[in-house]
């Protein structure tokens, strides 16, 4: 155990609850950990109290089984990453928010399956998106879908104070995932025929900083959620700022919900 005065190496934390989405989050977190040369820490939170020893045993057994399954999936990917596991006790949201103080990023699945895996989107993921002390990735579970040659990362250029950090994270993910970026921004729709010099300048400056990232600017005044609802582009990840965390449900959406056409869009909330 590290001494009080020794610095603690930050990790990529993944919330594990036994769901397919959590496995997806763990696999997604592997490249994040490797790229930063830090461990991948798989965390399965159990209840703070139990009405009986049998209930505790069931809860602990589920957590241990979930961690084994997640670790096996990560190891099967064949990538060299140090794996750590932990089973803390407490409400999942507050426990993971506190753990995020010592994390480079925290990754969670957006849906749960079964008795123990609750619907994370409505509780834990939302709490993390609003309160975590590091970026938060909310991952959709993968399903069989037609192959696509392009799997975009989408981000919006705004005048928000944290937008530059959001753009830098989008560029980092584009390099890591070898994906092109759709950059939304510019004038309102009714003025889209008029060139927006500021938007064009920011895109050009961004490209100069990251010449190896393919950036495709889209002039639109709509937000990411509305843009995705109106277009058919296949998007693997939307990158948003902490102040945009209220969009999370619209971007990720409940599984199979007819209103959310882009229910397979994962989200990275850039919190600092």
Curated annotation (Swiss-Prot):
**Record lineage:** Bacteria, Bacillati, Actinomycetota, Actinomycetes, Mycobacteriales
Which family, according to UniProt?
A: Belongs to the universal stress protein A family.
GO molecular function term, any single one: ATP binding
What's in the keyword line of the UniProt record? ATP-binding, Isopeptide bond, Nucleotide-binding, Ubl conjugation
Upregulation: A member of the dormancy regulon. Induced in response to reduced oxygen tension (hypoxia), low levels of nitric oxide (NO) and carbon monoxide (CO). It is hoped that this regulon will give insight into the latent, or dormant phase of infection.
Instruction: List, alphabetically, the Pfam families matched.
Output: Usp
Query: What's one GO BP annotation on this UniProt entry?
Result: response to stress
Binding positions (ATP): 15, 109-115, 123-124
Covalent link (Isoglutamyl lysine isopeptide (Lys-Gln) (interchain with Q-Cter in protein Pup)) residue numbers? 82
Q: PANTHER family per the record?
A: STRESS RESPONSE PROTEIN NHAX, UNIVERSAL STRESS PROTEIN UP12
Q: Does the keyword ATP-binding apply?
A: yes
Domain of life, per lineage: Bacteria
Q: Species name for this entry?
A: Mycobacterium tuberculosis (strain ATCC 25618 / H37Rv)
Name this protein carries in UniProt: Universal stress protein Rv2624c
* Any GO CC annotation of this UniProt entry: plasma membrane
């Amino acid at each position: 155990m590290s001494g009080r005065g020794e610095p603690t190496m930050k990790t990529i934390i993944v919330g594990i609850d036994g769901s397919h989405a959590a496995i997806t989050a763990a696999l997604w977190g592997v490249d994040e950990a490797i790229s930063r040369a830090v461990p991948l820490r798989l965390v399965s939170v159990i209840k703070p109290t139990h009405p009986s020893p049998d209930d505790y045993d069931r809860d602990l057994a589920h957590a241990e089984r979930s961690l084994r399954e997640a670790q096996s999936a990560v190891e099967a990917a064949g990538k060299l990453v140090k794996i750590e596991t932990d089973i803390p006790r407490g409400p999942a949201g507050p426990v993971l928010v506190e753990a995020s103080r010592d994390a480079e990023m925290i990754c969670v699945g957006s849906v749960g399956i079964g008795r123990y895996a609750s619907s994370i989107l409505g509780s834990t993921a939302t709490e993390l998106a609003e309160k975590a002390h590091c970026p938060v990735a909310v991952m959709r579970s993968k399903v069989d879908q037609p192959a696509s040659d392009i799997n975009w990362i989408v981000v919006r250029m705004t005048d928000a104070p944290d937008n530059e950090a959001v753009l830098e994270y989008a560029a980092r993910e584009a390099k890591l995932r070898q994906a092109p970026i759709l950059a939304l921004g510019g004038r309102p729709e009714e003025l889209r025929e008029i060139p927006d010099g500021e938007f064009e300048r920011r895109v050009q400056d961004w490209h100069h900083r990251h010449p190896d990232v393919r950036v495709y600017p889209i002039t639109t005044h709509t937000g990411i959620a509305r843009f995705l609802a109106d277009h058919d582009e296949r998007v693997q990840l939307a990158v948003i700022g902490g102040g945009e965390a209220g969009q999370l449900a619209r971007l990720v959406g409940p599984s199979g919900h007819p209103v959310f056409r882009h229910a397979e869009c994962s989200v990275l909330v850039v919190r600092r």
